[in-house]
């Protein structure tokens, strides 16, 4: 089997970012390591939300007594999203995998380029401290919560206009019928 294309070793920078206005946002993960390499991984909103959930499950499994997400709290020294140099690698994520390297006591993240073979070796592999993962999970929760509100019945994003909701059997609410805000 071929080796991973980019082995980032242990990362010292791990951030999630949403760019743009709700409904028109793009999402990315930014990773950096001690060697000064940077990776920009473009990711869909559903993927970033699933990543946050998967991180929470992994950390709960590793530390059942410590279930709380780390609040984002004070910003890292560099503002989120600032890249001082062009990234070493940049691609759109097709699939992600999480794991745990028990020998090193570090979490593992593997990402496959959307254009690559999902059954082949990952495009990027890195090791992440549990505290970094917990912080990333908090960032992801913050990013996802700032998006468009969702319909409480069907879960679809609301755009501010009339909304067709299958569970409501096509009926509009009184406010939607009258154009009330």
Language model segments and positions:
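Mixed-charge, glycine-accented linear interaction segment located at domain edges/termini
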Residues: 38, 111-166
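Short, structured motif recognition centered on aromatic/hydrophobic residues
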Residues: 25-31, 51, 55, 107-111, ...
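N-terminal pre-domain and mature-chain start segments
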Residues: 38-42, 50, 57-78, 116-117, ...
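Intrinsic, low-complexity N-terminal interaction/targeting segments
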Residues: 1-27, 69-127
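The feature marks the first
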Residues: 1-53, 57, 61
């Amino acid at each position: 089997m071929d080796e991973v294309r980019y082995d980032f070793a242990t990362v010292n920078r791990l951030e999630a970012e949403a760019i743009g206005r709700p409904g028109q946002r793009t999402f990315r993960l930014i990773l950096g390591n001690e060697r000064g390499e940077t990776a920009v991984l473009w990711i869909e909103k559903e993927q970033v939300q699933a990543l946050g959930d998967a991180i929470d499950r992994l950390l709960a499994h590793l530390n059942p007594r410590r279930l709380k997400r780390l609040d984002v709290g004070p910003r890292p020294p560099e503002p989120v999203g600032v890249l001082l140099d062009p990234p070493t690698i940049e691609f759109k994520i097709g699939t992600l995998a999480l794991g745990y390297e028990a020998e090193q006591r570090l979490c593992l993240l593997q990402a496959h380029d959307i254009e690559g073979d999902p059954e082949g070796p990952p495009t990027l592999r890195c090791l992440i401290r549990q505290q970094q993962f917990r912080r990333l999970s908090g960032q992801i929760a913050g990013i996802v919560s700032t998006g468009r509100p969702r319909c409480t019945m069907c879960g679809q994003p609301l755009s501010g206009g009339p909304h067709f909701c299958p569970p409501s059997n096509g009926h509009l609410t009184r406010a939607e019928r009258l154009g009330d805000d």
